Amino acid sequence: LLRGTVEAFLPTHEVFITDWVDARLVPISEGRFDLDDYIDYVIGMLQLLGPDVHVMAVCQPSVPVIAAIARMEAANDPHTPRSMTLMGGPIDTRVSRTEVNKLAEKRGIEWFKRNCIHKVPLPNVGFMRDVYPGFFQLAGFMAMNIDRHLEAHGEMFRHLVKGDGDSAEKHRDFYDEYLAVMDLTAEFYLQTVDKVFVKHQLPRGEMMHRDHKVDLTAIRRCGLMTVEGENDDISGVGQTQAAHGLCPNIPDALRAHWVQPKVGHYGVFNGSRFRAEIAPRIADFIATCEHLARKPARAGGKSGSSVVAFGGGRKGASRLAQD
């Protein structure tokens, strides 16, 4: 579903995107993968790509990405990215609670352990690994808007009857991507549910990475842009914007917030309104952060194009990283 996000930035930025392996394809002998590991990978990717990175985190990765940057800032890491753009992310799910948030709080973590975790079956390489199956996530998302999905399939049938192959093909292309889900390791899924949606550890200042506290007040140099959708029923309006209040030491010149009218969760990072209204604002924000970060000593050096990396972080003379 990030295909359109990448395409929007390719003409003007150097783009890198994180590539996570489906848990059912990883042998159990390879060990665990949890939220701490995710943050470690984000930090490692940013360090690999260099200090001129601009990170984009779409939805769930907003939490581990901002946590990773807080840890880097606290350590005065020279590879701290120039900016981060958090899009439709659950930074503080106590704000504008959606049905997703209410379910997590109502059920509690033990319910998710009992009902959502299963072992990978044969003949998959990850046989016997405990995972949260991708089809569970897919079923949950589709159930939230089942009428819309039924209507979309009815429209496709009507297009086929009329001989409108182009419209039907667009429908197929969308669902080819929408239905492409992967399994998550049980430990990563359960930690995310517990820390982000049940205990709200990040906004309460209680989140830990390994043995270190995640201190968002340490973020001072990295710019922060938040993007939300007016009709988002997964990450409600205000949940991502909450990051600004949690990062009080970022200068005002390095901040931006945008609520896109008339779009839901997926419209925040894909579709015509994203291309026409959101992507240009992100590009302007990246340019602003890049300009403010330049020093006179670098005036004669290479400027480079902004690099867009997706997810954990990535590269460039000026780079944008996305999850």
Annotated model-derived regions:
Residues 260-276:
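Catalytic histidine-centered segment of alpha/beta-hydrolase-like enzymes
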Residues 219-220, 226-228, 232:
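Short beta-strand/loop motif that positions the catalytic acidic residue
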Residues 198-216:
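Active-site nucleophile elbow and catalytic-triad environment of alpha/beta-hydrolase enzymes
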